[in-house]
Structure formats: C-alpha cells, structure tokens
C-alpha cells in the first residue's frame, strides 16, 4: 500500500490504551508512513498518537458517575466527531468503550469514512438488539473470541476473529516453582489463589465469603496455603479489615501481582470477570463465584441470554468450570466444589490448553492486517 496513511483511534480506558498501542506498533511495522490521531492514554501517546484530550475524561464507571459527567461526555463526543470529519482519516478505530465510541463511529460512517470497532461489547449476553446499532456503526468488528465472531456472522456484521493479546503474553506453560520463589512461598505443599475481584463492591460482596471458604478448606487440608492479590491499596485495606478478629489463616496478601499468584497456585477461587480468562491461560483449575445486589440479580436474570457467566464456559461452549451464583455461593458449597480440583483438575486444564492455543493468534498483527485490508478496499 503506497502513500501516507492517517489513522484515527479512540480509546476510553486503560485496557483500550494497551490494545491501541499494540495495534499502532503492528500498523507501523506494516506501513511506516502513518499518522495517528484521536484519543488515547500514555501508551498510545508513546507510540505517536496526538491525543485531542486526556483519555481519562472518558473513563467513567457507575450509573451515577456517568450521569454526573454526561453533559461533558456529550460535548466532547460532538467536538471529536466534528474534528475527525474535518481530518478525514483513512480509517477510524474505536477501541472498546462502546457507549462512547460506537456513536462516534456511526457519525463518521455516515460522513463516508471507514470505521472499525475493536473489542466486542457483550451483545451476545444481553441487550442483543445493540447488534443493529453496531451493524450501522462500523464496517468491521474485530473480535477477541471465536464465539463473538460466530454471533456477528449470524447477524450479518462483517467480523474478524483476531485472538486475545493475553494469549500471546502468557506462556503456554507457566513456571510454578519460579513464581513461588519470587513470592517467597514454599515450593512444596498446595496453594490456593483467592481472587474476589478488583472493585470495592465486588470485594465487599465476595471477600468475607472467600475467606470463610479458605477457613473451611484449611480445616480439611491443614497444609494448605493461600495467596490473595490486591488490585490497589484500597482493596488491601478492605481485605485487612475483613481479616481482623478472624482465626489466623496462612494467607499472603500481594500488591497487584495477580499473574504471579496465578502462576504460583494449584487452584483458584475467583470472581466472574476478565480474571477468569487469565486463570484459564495459566491453566489453573478454578471455581467461579459471584454475588450482586438482589434487585440487580433479578434484573440481570431477565436480561442475560447466555447460559454461562464466566469466559471459560463461554469459550468452551459448555459448563467446564463450576459457577456458583448468589445464594448458591456459600462457604460450604465453594469449599466442597474446589477441594476435588486440588486432587485432580486435569479435565479443566486440558480444555484450557486447547483454548489458549486457539486464542494465540497474535491479536495486534491480525487486527492490523484486517484494518489495512479494509483501507485497501476503498
């Protein structure tokens, strides 16, 4: 492809900044004469993006917070659309953050520009009618998972399965001994990772439950040890408060280091979320648990169309890992379900290995190829 390319990218959160920077590297490797404009974080800026405003202005979580910032978000989106239409990039790529980026993509596509969306929203699980908006908004969807690609194909949306970047980052075989040495854990004996989530609300719902489960497991298996990676200082303080007044537990709290914890452990008790994909890629047998407010659960039960909540089961297309939700998630049930996996989790591990290899596609390279092919079809 000859000539200079102008590529617009819009990311709204840290995970999108990581994906965006990898995509920018892969695009430049294939087409050195390239200019990047749009909105991104420090990683994308380090790759040469001229960001129109700080990405953090789009990073809003929670309904109340979104409502409080809605006038600013709408104003920024309107200005961004106008700026990008004037700039006439060869292609615009929205990275995740669908509530913001899909609106931008839709307006740019109406103005005759090529648009791509990188990372599918969970339309296959709930609010499936959003696929109609996606079909109008983008020329191409870049999907991280094969079941997402199948969903879009069924709904007439051009899609390319590119794999997941973590599948290339995480080795096919993690070194458990080296991880334990780095964490100062004994090399013999079994270790269970407790991962109750990264947000305060999740830890509030699951932290005590996971600690109670650990106490039960310890009663059955006196030599067991536990590690719990804390996503932030606030989460560590939250867990430390929960530990006060409890019977002593052979538990190591870690600052971050969730990947080290997964590499070091023999099995995982884990909140439903993206961390379950990381546990799968580390080939660690797991039990998934989740609790939300009662009203939220009743609403989600009506809206969610998927039979599973965890990525390992969605990727396997069957109930591969146990999911204990709401009232079913009790210390006794979790301990009873997890304990056999410490003796033999090979069935899960075999599937995890096959899934890891399927996702190991070099996502950034695949995404870059798909974007450039779209541009060539002008």
UniProtKB/Swiss-Prot annotation:
Gene Ontology terms: biological process: lipid A biosynthetic process
Keyword field contains Transferase: yes
Pfam families: LpxB (PF02684)
Record EC number: 2.4.1.182
Catalytic activity: a lipid X + a UDP-2-N,3-O-bis[(3R)-3-hydroxyacyl]-alpha-D-glucosamine = a lipid A disaccharide + UDP + H(+)
MF (Gene Ontology): lipid-A-disaccharide synthase activity; phospholipid binding
Function: Condensation of UDP-2,3-diacylglucosamine and 2,3-diacylglucosamine-1-phosphate to form lipid A disaccharide, a precursor of lipid A, a phosphorylated glycolipid that anchors the lipopolysaccharide to the outer membrane of the cell.
Family the entry assigns: Belongs to the LpxB family.
Name of the featured protein: Lipid-A-disaccharide synthase
Species lineage: Bacteria, Pseudomonadati, Pseudomonadota, Gammaproteobacteria, Pseudomonadales
Gene this protein is translated from: lpxB
């Amino acid at each position: 492809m000859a000539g200079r390319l102008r590529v617009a990218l819009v990311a709204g959160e840290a995970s999108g900044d990581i994906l965006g920077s990898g995509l920018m590297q892969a695009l430049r490797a294939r087409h050195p004469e390239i200019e990047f404009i749009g909105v991104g974080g420090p990683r994308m800026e380090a790759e040469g993006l001229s960001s129109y405003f700080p990405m953090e202005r789009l990073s809003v979580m929670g309904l109340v917070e979104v409502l409080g910032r809605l006038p600013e978000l709408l104003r920024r989106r309107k200005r961004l659309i106008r700026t990008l239409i004037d700039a006439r990039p060869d292609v615009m790529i929205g990275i995740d953050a669908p509530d913001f980026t899909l609106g931008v993509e839709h307006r740019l596509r109406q103005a005759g520009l090529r648009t791509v969306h990188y990372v599918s929203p969970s339309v296959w699980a709930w609010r499936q009618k959003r696929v109609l908006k996606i079909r109008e908004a983008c020329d191409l969807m870049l999907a991280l998972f094969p079941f997402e690609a199948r969903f879009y194909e069924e709904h007439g949306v051009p899609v390319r399965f590119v794999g997941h970047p973590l599948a290339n980052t995480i080795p096919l075989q993690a070194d458990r001994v080296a991880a334990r040495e780095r964490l100062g854990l004994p090399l013999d004996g079994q270790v269970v990772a407790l991962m109750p989530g990264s947000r305060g609300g999740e830890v509030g719902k699951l932290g005590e439950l996971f600690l109670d489960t650990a106490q039960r497991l310890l009663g059955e298996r006196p030599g067991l040890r536990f590690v719990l990676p804390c996503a932030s200082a606030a989460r560590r303080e939250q867990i430390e408060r929960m530990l006060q007044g409890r019977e002593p537990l052979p538990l190591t709290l870690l600052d971050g280091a969730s990947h080290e914890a997964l590499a070091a452990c023999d099995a995982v008790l884990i909140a439903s979320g993206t961390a379950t994909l990381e546990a799968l890629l580390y080939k660690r047998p797991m039990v998934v648990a989740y609790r939300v407010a009662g009203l939220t659960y009743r609403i989600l039960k009506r809206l969610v169309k998927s039979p599973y909540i965890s990525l390992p089961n969605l990727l396997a297309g069957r109930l591969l890992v146990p999911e204990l939700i709401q009232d079913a998630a009790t210390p006794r049930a979790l301990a009873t379900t997890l304990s056999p996996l410490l003796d033999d989790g090979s069935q899960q591990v075999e599937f995890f290995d096959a899934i890891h290899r399927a996702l190991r596609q070099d996502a950034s390279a695949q995404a870059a190829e798909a974007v450039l092919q779209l541009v060539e079809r002008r």
